[in-house]
């Protein structure tokens, strides 16, 4: 998934094409874990990295690293745990001194996610994005930079207003409507909108109203 627009890429197809040429694949899945219903091994990639604070709601500072078992021994990180065998993936997690309370939240976050259900959460995220984006996709002056097809996007979308720089749009949304967004200034131009499962349709109605008022001004 592309973070600035929410596009879902056909990773399995890309991995297969790369492997056919003898190329190993590392996937940046920062916005997928806790967002999309999938299993990393099904992608076929050699390496996969993700943030856990984005959609799994773990505190800042926690991440995920997946390495195919036969690839672990070939990796030589700058910092590593020298007490582990070369084929032990735990040597790639050089902890040092850090806030251990973050690690202690990971299991609770996973349990909460599993209680909701991966499929239910993905469906909810896609519903929320469609709820607001379909109300403005054809509205004069508003530009949607995210695909309409459900299989090509989920919770994230990128929206802009003609003639208004993303940073200006983000500032107006915050200052005038108390709505916080992320300004994206290329390669697509707009604001990234990222509701979560607790976002209400009433809140999205306020956002749609704000976008339309700005587009009309």
Regions found by a protein language model. Give the residues of each.
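Pyridoxal 5′-phosphate
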Residues: 1-217
């Amino acid at each position: 998934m592309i973070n600035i627009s929410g596009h879902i890429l056909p990773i399995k197809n890309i991995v297969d094409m790369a492997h056919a040429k003898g190329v190993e694949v590392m996937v940046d899945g920062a916005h997928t874990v806790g967002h999309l219903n999938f299993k990393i091994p099904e992608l076929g990639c050699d390496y996969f990295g993700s943030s856990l604070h984005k959609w799994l709601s773990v505190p800042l500072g926690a991440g995920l690293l997946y390495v195919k078992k036969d690839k672990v021994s070939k990796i030589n990180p700058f910092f590593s745990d020298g007490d582990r065998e070369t084929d032990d993936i735990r040597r790639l997690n050089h902890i040092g001194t850090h806030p251990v309370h973050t690690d202690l939240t990971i299991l609770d976050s996973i349990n909460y996610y599993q209680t909701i259900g991966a499929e239910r959460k993905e469906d909810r995220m896609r519903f929320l994005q469609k709820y607001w984006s379909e109300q403005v996709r054809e509205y004069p002056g508003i530009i949607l930079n995210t695909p309409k097809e459900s299989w090509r996007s989920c919770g994230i979308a990128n929206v802009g207003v003609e003639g208004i720089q993303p940073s200006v749009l983000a500032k107006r949304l915050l200052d005038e409507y108390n709505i916080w967004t992320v300004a994206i200034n290329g390669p697509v131009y707009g604001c990234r909108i990222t509701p979560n499962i607790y976002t209400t349709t009433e809140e999205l109605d306020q956002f749609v109203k704000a976008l339309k008022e700005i587009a009309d001004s």
